[in-house]
């Protein structure tokens, strides 16, 4: 079995495949059309020689990293895992790699780990970047798509979001009309979190639409975290003169 040698060069690949160095370069950088027959031959030769293009040289030649970044404030989320699997599948299908990093937008002592210096574009999940960070990257015309978050009003950045208000409204209305519930407790997430805000808005709208007064005492803080939700509910139940409730609507899976 042929072992990879660090001394294998692009010229050797070209000679063995019977093509020019320029053709090999075009194949590696995918910046010009090459016939299917030549592409297959180069693929086979590179595999036989165990030739791996130098990433830095490839990037310099093409001005592309062929890497898509994904930035999130947390990777420990039941919702995040299936989403990540789908993103990775699409990225690889188009010949790109996926670079994943966590970053908290309140950490001003260091720049975001993903950006124009190491990716061709970026997916920003939830609160991965502050509005100021987004504005700065957008000013540099760096391609971005926001996931599970709407862009600042001043920016036209593509976004993929969930209709939180509509879904929460329908869930609460289902509890009211089908299960005849009138005292519905709501576990919200962090107060300034976008998803939490719109789910609470949908909750309140459904109560109002069905003639049920909103009772602020039935809105508890779960912080999108199971331990916090458990502690909050335990404290609520142990309280004297407990407010009656006949259903619980949680704003996330962890609280549920």
Regions found by a protein language model. Name each.
Residues 1-64:
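N-terminal helix-turn-helix DNA-binding module of bacterial transcription factors
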Residues 1-5, 66-173, 238, 242:
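Alpha-helical recognition/docking segments in bacterial nutrient-uptake
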Residues 13, 24, 42, 68, ...:
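Hydrophobic structural packing positions in well-ordered secondary structure
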Residues 21-25, 60-75, 183-190:
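Short beta-strand segments enriched in small/hydrophobic residues
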Residues 73-82, 100-109, 160-170, 186-234, ...:
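Hinge/beta->alpha junction and helix N-cap segments in small-molecule ligand-binding domains
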Residues 119-126, 183-187, 241-252:
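Periplasmic-binding protein-like
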Residues 172-184:
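Glycine-rich phosphate/diphosphate-binding loops that line cofactor/substrate pockets in enzymes
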């Amino acid at each position: 079995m042929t072992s990879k040698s660090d001394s294998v060069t692009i010229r050797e690949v070209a000679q063995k495949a019977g093509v020019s160095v320029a053709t090999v370069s075009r194949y590696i950088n995918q910046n010009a059309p090459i016939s299917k027959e030549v592409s297959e031959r180069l693929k086979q030769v590179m595999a036989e020689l165990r030739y791996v293009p130098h990433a830095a040289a490839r990037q310099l030649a093409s001005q592309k990293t062929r890497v898509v970044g994904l930035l999130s404030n947390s990777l420990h989320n039941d919702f995040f895992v299936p989403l990540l699997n789908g993103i990775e599948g699409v990225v690889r299908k188009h010949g790109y790699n996926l670079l994943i990093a966590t970053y908290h937008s309140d950490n001003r002592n260091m720049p975001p780990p993903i950006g124009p210096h190491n990716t061709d574009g970026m997916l920003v999940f939830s609160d991965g970047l502050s509005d100021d960070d987004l504005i700065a990257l957008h000013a540099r015309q760096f391609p971005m798509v926001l996931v599970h978050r709407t862009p600042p009003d001043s920016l036209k950045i593509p976004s993929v979001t969930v209709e939180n208000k509509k879904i929460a409204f329908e869930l609460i209305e289902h509890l009211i009309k089908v299960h005849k519930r009138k005292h519905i407790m709501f576990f919200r997430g962090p107060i300034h979190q976008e998803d939490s805000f719109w789910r609470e808005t949908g909750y309140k709208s459904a109560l109002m639409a069905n003639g049920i007064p909103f009772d602020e005492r039935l809105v508890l803080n779960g912080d999108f975290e199971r331990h916090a939700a458990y502690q909050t509910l335990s404290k609520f139940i142990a309280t004297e003169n407990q407010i009656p409730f006949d259903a619980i609507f949680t704003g996330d899976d962890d609280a549920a």
